[in-house]
Amino acid sequence: MRGLACLLAMLVGIQAIERLRLADGPHGCAGRLEVWHSGRWGTVCDDGWDLRDAEVACRVLGCGGALAAPGGAFFGEGTGPVWLSELNCRGNEGQLGICPHRGWKAHICSHEEDAGVVCVGQRAANSREDSMSLLDGDPWLALSGELSPSSEEPPITHAPQPAASSQNGPRKKNPRPPKQTKSTRAPVLTNGAPHQERLRLVSGPHGCAGRLEVWHGGRWGTVCDDGWDLRDAAVACRELGCGGALAAPGGARFGPGEGPVWMDDVGCGGGEEALRDCPRSPWGRSNCDHTEDAGLVCTGPAPRIRLADGPHGCAGRLEVWHGGRWGSVCDDAWDLRDAAVACKELGCGGALAAPGGAFFGEGTGPIILDDLRCRGNETALRFCPARPWGQHDCHHREDAGAVCDGMPLGAVQPTVPAVDSNSTAHRLLSTSVGQMPGPAGPWPPSASPTAPPEPGPEAGSPQLRLVAGPSRCSGRLEVWHDGRWGTVCDDSWDMRDSAVVCRELGCGRPRQPDPAAGRFGWGAGPIWLDDVGCMGTEASLSECPAASWGKHNCAHNEDVGVTCTGTPGLDTISDPFSWSWLPGLGRDQDAWLPGELTTKPSASLTSSVPQKPTKVPGKAPKSTKKWVTKNARRPTTQPPGMPTTKHSRAPGTPTSLHPTARTSELPKRLTTEAPHRQTSHTTVRLTPRVPWEWTSEPVVSQSTQGPQEVTSEATTTENPQTSLEPSGENTEGSLESSQDPATTPTAGVPVPSGPFRVRLADGPNRCAGRLEVWHAGLWGTVCDDSWDIRDATVACWELGCGKVRPRVGKTHYGPGTGPIWLDDMGCKGSEMSLSDCPSGAWGKHNCDHEEDVVLTCTGYTGDDDYPSWTWDPTSGEDLTKGTTVAARPGHTLSWATTTNTEVPSPATQNLPDTDDQGGYESSWTWDTPSGRGLFKGTPTTTKPGSTVTTSTSKSPGHPFPAPRARAGSPRKPTPERRPLPTSATTSSPASSSSPEPSGSRQTSGSWPQLIPDSKQEGTSSSPKPSLLTPGLPSPATFALSTPNTSLLPTRSPELSGSPTPTSPEGLTSASSMLSEVSRLSPTSELTPGPDTTPAPEIIPESSDSSDLPMNTRTPTQPFTASHPTSIPQLNTTSYPTIAPQPTTNPQQPRSPHPATSPQPPTNTHPSSTPATPTESLPSSRKTELSSPTKPRLNSELTFEEAPSTDASQTQNLELFLASESGPSSPSPASNLDPLPTDAFKPPRSQTLHSASDHLTQGPTPNHNPDPFGPCVSPLPPVRVMACEPPALVELVGAVREVGDQLQRLTWVLEQDRQERQVLALGLAQLVEAAQGLGQLSETVKRLAEVAWPPSTPVPMTTTTEEEERPLRGDV
């Protein structure tokens, strides 16, 4: 019975294990292994997991053999139970359940130990999970191009091909097709002459160094070194196949050449594919001779690598070409980081495994490399540290291999082109330079020369398709370009991009895929598009911004899949899981069986999709958002009937500027010499060197591609010498426009400049991360100087990510790399793009990457709320800078402000609150040199057609340096993120409208360097009396905002560190860092907070202020001397009369009797009472009433605009000051010097009488303290406890002593700082005086020159006074 039970259990186990699947892998035969048991999917623990277990699993799954058995949740952590652990297969089992294991149960392994497999074959990622059907035949055959023993060049490894296609010699390759030549360049084609410009290096030490020569017009010529730098050299080295550039010597370093000087003033950006694509002077035009010939020193040919004896071109034994032969790599220190670099160099994506031990068999050649130690971020193995070439201590049984997650993209292009003497376009080398190993001709074509051409899209059909899916409206997205179908990378891909694809294919709307969907297998061929950023309104994917054709950082495991809601067409198959994957074996594309689902649109659906030619995607600027409803661009069955127009990207090409709304490129460095009027239906981004005049007028679109509509058109009047910024790199050499310039209503419009693209990098999603801006072909960051909610609102709006999500603290997404493009952004919050905001010039900043802007947005709204193209970043809420106008469905944020006489379409109606009643429009004018004055902009009213003036000196590189009239209601201008002028420092309007340098003397007396935290709103920049000198009218006066300021919560004439709500906003002590110290001082009585209201019951105690000690020291007052150019000092002392000198006995207890409660009337002056709680200047702190120099200052106190103070408020102040007096605090008169004498100690027996330690808000009844003990005397009602123990009393006393010492130290430092300030002010004034004298002398000299020119003799006439003086000869 036991045997039967075991057999039954085994059968049950086998039945359970028969259902396997691989999840979260790059394809159907790689991923995390999951098993079905007890009605649930679970994972397998990696304890004991090895290649033998993976071999069984791959065989059960029908994926062939096993390549790797990664553990540690390599493909991510799974969910559910961990069903199996400690599998111990031999490798030949037919089922995984036959292998010994620890039983079916939920094991204690965590999902961090989930096992995975990488199998040889591939299946569809969405194929049946429990499918176990084997692939038909052996999908992986031998590689082509075996190396002949006598061959000196390496073979070119192609995609998997049948063994019959192997050759014993090098494969002949067609040359790279020439690019479209510019119309100004027509080289004379002689016998054997190249069809395009070629380069060579002569007179150098090797083939990758020497004098650069160019073939043009049937002759070799040189290049002038004017403007020649490393960026130009990098392009030339790359074109020559010589790696990177080491140096760019000029001055005929490699000897003078012969023939013409073909090129001059070359200005490459470094990213061009060929030197001919760089801006330069016309052919043959130069001001150079051969003593200025340019040269090159390149890094040399890079070694090539390949993966041999593997199942396909992206898995196998790693071999390196060196010394004219292939060799292997030793597996010492070989790991995934090294394999990742090799996979990246091969174009095979990332690394799945790095097997050693000759996993793919032993090599036969030399062992080239050993001890490779890559970091993983290198672009090629040659950049990794390793032993010298050929030095090793290994055997071929230690050969390293790699398994990559990508499939070979057609033929693997070698780094060094192969020599092909039969090629008519091979690279010619100097006869003095020996032939280098490896090819020297152009790279092989993208497709095999023997392969039949791929069938392209049918005439009039979209240039894209969905393949490998269950229907024509679901599958992997492929795009037709350059005669080939290619895939699209899923970087930045979202529902808006899918919406454009579904609309173009006539498949309805996109369907939100579940997490496991969206993958329809790996594509083949090139990856054409990456970083697609559609807005959702485009009629075609070609209108969306994206990276250049073929520029990406992806592998085919990132191919985009799209699922639309449209009804499947006639090519639908019945069972979506009835096909199997079969590689193309190098002959044709990889295909699905039965039948190739390459989704050719059926006849019934052809007329439902738009018919338009394809153009270069990714070049339309972000500002060309078509704020129209989706009905405005419905596909039509009418063919456009307009030929495709190509515009050359070469500079200087006489191309007619007739772009349309889809034009995406323009000639570089194009300069118009004559002014002409330009109109455009899109936002034309021009970089002005002179002011522009913007007018707005309604026009009726003449487009015949859709329903006519009334749109608003921005019209610009261009002045001479207006530079149009290039839009970036275009490797294709040409662009396409979908309209004929001759029939375009907007003929003569300049081509829009390059796209101002933004993105959020390194964040958890596309709407959170570090803000980066695309400029000059590079992504760069934005500095956070002056960045606030208004700038973030514009950025979120432009990204289509809704509103700004409030964050607590700062979210870190890591520092960026590359340049810091923008700084000092100054958006108002209503702009539609960051390019419309004022900022510093491109690349001008004072930041590092620790200050990069990070942004978190709420995300775009769903389709159920608004259409996919509308965003409401601020919901119209009034921001600090002004009200932001938000787009709503059916409205357009129009540039025009005039009311159309015709009935506008819903897509072009202005928002109700975008215009003034009179048709006026709000704009802003900057009048500071940097464009960032104290005010971001002063609101001005501009009529349509008027000029928005600005004197902002912006760099020409900035997209929109000038302010633009924005649609929106006028808003109050606010200062630029600086403390507003407070009542203590009321600056004149002139001083508040323009900033001064930080080092100059500000008229308001505010010195930011003296304020610990000037950015807090509650912090004041009060003027220092040491900076004010009598003799000049004061621009800053002290004014109280409310009559209740007499009740400000100060315990002494000095200010608290933070003002109360009734105080003027932003006004605190100029030395705000002492506010916390003052709370521990004897005068502050350890109050809980600054809002404490004095209790009236302490009033009687302040009458004995004469018993408290008085500091007899008079601190140095360097600021009491008169200064000839300073502002009068303001004395804010509340006691203009000299009080009688009190006794200095520190131990004499204070009398508790209330008979002495009335305050002396001479201690407080009613007119100066309001200033007492708001002034904390050192002059008042360091002034003694007995000092003979201070009464002079008392008369200088003025209160301009101060409200009258009634008697009750004055009495309240007196009561407040009296209540703050205690046994350890001086009287109000003595409080002018907060430094008590060293002999003063707070008496222990009287400590508890200073009951203000525990004051709370609100008055309490009076109590007469009893001096006989702390536990029996009546005390104020608010206390920590009913009877304070002696230990607490001693602690309070000790704290007060510490506060005294801290206060003494603080005031010593303050005095030293004031002396330094006075000295600095004196020096500054001396310098100003010297400058003034110099200017005066220059003025006198100029006047003298005007009065008596050098050619005119000095008149001899003298005045009567001069005649009475004795002449020099008479003396």
From Swiss-Prot:
Gene Ontology annotations for the cellular component aspect, listed alphabetically: collagen-containing extracellular matrix; cytoplasm; extracellular region; extracellular space; membrane
Biased composition range(s): Basic and acidic residues: 665-676
Name of the protein in its database record: Soluble scavenger receptor cysteine-rich domain-containing protein SSC5D
Signal peptide residue numbers: 1-16
Quaternary organization: Interacts with LGALS1 and laminin.
Record-level GO BP terms: defense response; defense response to Gram-negative bacterium; defense response to Gram-positive bacterium; detection of bacterial lipoprotein; innate immune response; negative regulation of interleukin-8 production; regulation of interleukin-8 production
PTM characteristics: Partially N- and O-glycosylated.
Taxonomic superkingdom: Eukaryota
Role according to the record: Binds to extracellular matrix proteins. Binds to pathogen-associated molecular patterns (PAMPs) present on the cell walls of Gram-positive and Gram-negative bacteria and fungi, behaving as a pattern recognition receptor (PRR). Induces bacterial and fungal aggregation and subsequent inhibition of PAMP-induced cytokine release. Does not possess intrinsic bactericidal activity. May play a role in the innate defense and homeostasis of certain epithelial surfaces.
Ranges of biased composition (kind: Pro residues): 439-456, 1149-1163
Glycosylation: residue positions: N377, N422, N1044, N1131
UniProt biased composition (Polar residues): 599-611, 653-663, 698-740, 894-912, 1039-1086, 1102-1148, 1164-1189, 1244-1261
Subcellular compartments: Secreted; Cytoplasm
